[in-house]
């Protein structure tokens, strides 16, 4: 893929309203779940690191090892950004058993056909008592050309995601939907987007970013709306949303 794409995606991960608000929510949910663990001394594996923003988020909790399946993306980030990403697949993680305190796959397992194997591999390299963090897109009702362009195999419900974790004997600490307030507008947009030619849908854009100027008033409003869910998530789990967050422990 053209290196300019990775440069654009690097900016997108750091400036687009969806990525920015998502980062704050995921960081907060992880922080609240750590409890008595040393919150800045964990050995962390970040699967699907892309251009490194999620690794930046996770670095507040400890030392992060970044893994990325896209070889061209690895080459770009390692040469241009000095991020030291490792090329590898979630289906065959190149690490020994019980190596990490926390293993994360943020919007990753929907990209692999055998998601059960992917989560099993996460469990294998996670220490006993360690944490496994996953986020995924929710509800096939929201399926659109965006999912097709980004090579998704599926979207999840809470029950379908929890079923995977239960089958491989992981204990759920917290599971919640998020990006809830914008669920109806995004549903409407996704339905309308079926009329948009696939070539105009940006690969990797979590919220169909081609239609938003990152500095526009609308983007700033959307960011504040999405970020406002932090207050709700401090009180309770959300009953539906565009995405799902789950954090589990390995016995």
Predicted regions and their residues:
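Short, glycine-/aromatic-enriched active-site segment of Class I SAM-dependent methyltransferases
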Residues: 7-13, 132-154, 158-166
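Core SAM-dependent methyltransferase catalytic element
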Residues: 190, 194, 238-251
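Conserved N-terminal segment of class I S-adenosyl-L-methionine
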Residues: 1-98, 102-106, 117-119, 210-216, ...
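A short glycine-rich, Lys/Arg-flanked "PGG" loop and its adjoining helix->strand segment in the class I
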Residues: 116-131
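Residues lining the SAM
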Residues: 106-109, 135
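C-terminal helical/coil "lid" or tail adjacent to the Rossmann-like core of SAM-dependent
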Residues: 185-223
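Conserved S-adenosyl-L-methionine
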Residues: 170-180
């Amino acid at each position: 893929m053209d290196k300019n794409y990775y440069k654009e995606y690097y900016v997108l991960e750091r400036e687009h309203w969806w990525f920015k608000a998502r980062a704050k929510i995921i960081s907060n949910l992880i922080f609240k779940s750590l409890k008595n663990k040393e919150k800045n001394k964990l050995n962390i594996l970040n699967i699907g690191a892309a251009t490194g923003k999620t690794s930046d988020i996770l670095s507040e909790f400890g030392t992060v090892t970044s893994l990325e399946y896209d070889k061209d993306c690895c080459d770009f980030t390692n040469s241009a950004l000095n991020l030291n990403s490792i090329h590898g697949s979630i289906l065959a993680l190149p690490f020994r058993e019980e190596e990490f305190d926390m293993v994360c796959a943020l919007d990753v397992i929907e990209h692999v056909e055998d998601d059960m194997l992917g989560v099993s591999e996460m469990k294998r390299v996670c220490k006993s008592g360690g944490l496994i963090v996953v986020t995924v897109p929710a509800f096939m009702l929201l399926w659109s050309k965006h999912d097709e362009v980004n090579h998704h195999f599926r979207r999840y419900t809470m029950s379908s995601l929890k079923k995977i974790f239960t089958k491989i004997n992981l204990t759920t600490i917290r599971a919640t939907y998020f990006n809830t307030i914008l669920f109806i507008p995004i549903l409407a947009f996704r339905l309308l987007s079926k009329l948009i030619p696939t070539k105009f849908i940006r690969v990797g854009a979590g919220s169909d970013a081609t239609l938003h100027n990152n500095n526009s008033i609308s983007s700033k409003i959307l960011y504040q709306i999405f970020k406002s869910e932090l207050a709700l998530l401090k009180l309770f789990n959300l009953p539906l949303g565009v995405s799902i967050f789950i954090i589990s422990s390995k016995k």
